[in-house]
Every structure is written in structure tokens, then in C-alpha cells.
A protein has these predicted regions:
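Active-site and NAD+-binding cores of ADP-ribose-processing enzymes
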Residues: 2-27, 37-38, 51-259
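Short glycine-centered helix-capping/turn motifs at secondary-structure transition points
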Residues: 28-32
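Short, surface-exposed loop/strand segments
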Residues: 33, 39-47
């Protein structure tokens, strides 16, 4: 089953953040400002260029590469590759957007909120469809410690809602190590930055491994076996009583087409 995109079709990625995924199924896609107004907790993944009343999205029109398009540059600069192919995403239609202030080549900005009736489908790339939960990455490669900490706390609350408690001391040790590394990185001289960036990424990888094991254990406890990403997306969609089709999209893109 393939979705029939048009030039104004938009996409919004949530990574593998199942808490955010469920929140959108209940409330629509909210900006930080709307989240506060509606008492819905919204966490940033990155310190982006969008303001608190704006939502970052990808416009389908901008991902259709021309014959002379440098696909390596697109993968580096494009939001589609980073945030749509590498996670769960929503298809959005019939909303107004702005292009002038967007940061990435295929990014647009939507004001305030996307209502549920504007969301037309869910997307997962074929690379991750059958992946087990323990094999996914749950934190963005962000150099913003506060964002990472907020997302980690969100995951802990989310797992608690399913009756699963993490080893909080282990989490605190990892998040504190990330904070120490982050502070050292902020204060570093130019000569030390590269090594400290590597240290930061190593700690973030350890934190992701910790969270992946716990999220996997949380849903293993619920279902009695290890489920795939696709299985969980179906379960969460049905749990929230949302009748949205799920589309599997190709992970690999070539010049001018998807493969």
C-alpha cells in the first residue's frame, strides 16, 4: 500500500519516541506553546531554529531529487533522511506552512497545532519495520544536555505508565556522566573539542543502550515476548482508537526516485 503524496503533503517525524507518538495520537501535533496551553508536556529533540509556536515538518515536494541532485548533500542537510526515514512519522495534509525561515533544505514550519483530522497516515521505513525495540536508538544526536535529560525523564514516566520501573540509580549515573561531559565540552579549548565530542557521543551511546534495554523489557513484560517496531506501532494505534493507515516507505533513495 502506497500513499498518494501531493506537492503540499507534509511529514512530521518523532524518532522512536513512543511517548510522543501516543501523545500525538491523542492530542494532535502541538508546538511547545500549544503544549503548555493544553497542559501537554512537549520536549524538544534539538535546539532548532523554530520558535516555541512553530512545528518543524518536511514538505514532500522538496524531497523529489532532480537528475543532478547531490544525494549525499541531501542526506547530510535534509530533514527527510534524518527525521522521517530514521523513525516513525506522520503524514499531514491541508495545513498552511512557511518556508522562508526553515533551516534545512526540505523543512517547512507550521504554526501552533495540527489537528488530528489533518493527520492522514503513519510511516515507518522498511529498514526498521521488523527491528526489535532493543535495537533502536531513542535519543537524538543532540549536544543539548537539557533536551537529552528531559527526553530521558519522559521515557521513565512513560514506562511507569505501563507498570515498569527502571533502575533509577543507574540512570542517574549515566545522565550525570553526560552532564559532566557536556560541561567540559562547553568550556573546552579548540584543541580539546574533538576528543570531548567523542566522549560525549560515547556517553550518549551508553545512555541509549540503557534506555533501549529498559524499553524493550517494559514491553516484553507486557506482551510476554520481544515485539517488533511494527507490532508496537499497531498496538499503540489501536490502543488510542485511531484509524490511521500505516505505510512502509523505502529507506534507500537514489537520484530522482526512491528505491
Amino acid at each position: 500500500m502506497e500513499y498518494k503524496y501531493n506537492s503540499d503533503t507534509l511529514m512530521h517525524g518523532v524518532g522512536f519516541n513512543f511517548s510522543k507518538f501516543e501523545s500525538i495520537l491523542s492530542h494532535g501535533i502541538l508546538s511547545l506553546e500549544c503544549g503548555k496551553a493544553e497542559n501537554v508536556r512537549i520536549n524538544r529533540s534539538f535546539k532548532g531554529h523554530n520558535k516555541d509556536d512553530e512545528i518543524s515538518m518536511v514538505r514532500y515536494l522538496y524531497i523529489d531529487a532532480y537528475d543532478d541532485f547531490d544525494i549525499k548533500l541531501f542526506n547530510k542537510e535534509g530533514a527527510y533522511y534524518r527525521y522521517i526515514l530514521n523513525g516513525i512519522s506522520f503524514i499531514v495534509e491541508d495545513v498552511q506552512f512557511e518556508t522562508q525561515k526553515a533551516h534545512r533544505v526540505d523543512e517547512v514550519l507550521v504554526k501552533n497545532k495540527v489537528e488530528l483530522d489533518k493527520i492522514k497516515g503513519i510511516q515507518i521505513s522498511d529498514k526498521y519495520k521488523d527491528a526489535l525495540l532493543e535495537d533502536l536508538f531513542y535519543f537524538p544526536m543532540s549536544k543539548n544536555y537539557e533536551n537529552i535529560k528531559n527526553i530521558g525523564e519522559e521515557y521513565i514516566r512513560y514506562m511507569a505508565s505501563y507498570g515498569y520501573e527502571v533502575n533509577i540509580n543507574e540512570y542517574k549515573n549515566l545522565i550525570n556522566e553526560l552532564r559532566y561531559t557536556y560541561n567540559a565540552l562547553i568550556d573546552a579549548s579548540k584543541e580539546d573539542i574533538e576528543d570531548l565530542e567523542d566522549d560525549y557521543e560515547d556517553v550518549l551511546a551508553d545512555l541509549n543502550e540503557y534506555m533501549a534495554q529498559n524499553i524493550s523489557a517494559c514491553f516484553r513484560k507486557k506482551f510476554g515476548y520481544d515485539i517488533t517496531l511494527y507490532d508496537l506501532v499497531i498496538f499503540l494505534r489501536n490502543k488510542n482508537k485511531v484509524n490511521l493507515p500505516i505505510y512502509i516507505i523505502p529507506y534507500t533513495r537514489e537520484k530522482g526516485k526512491a528505491k
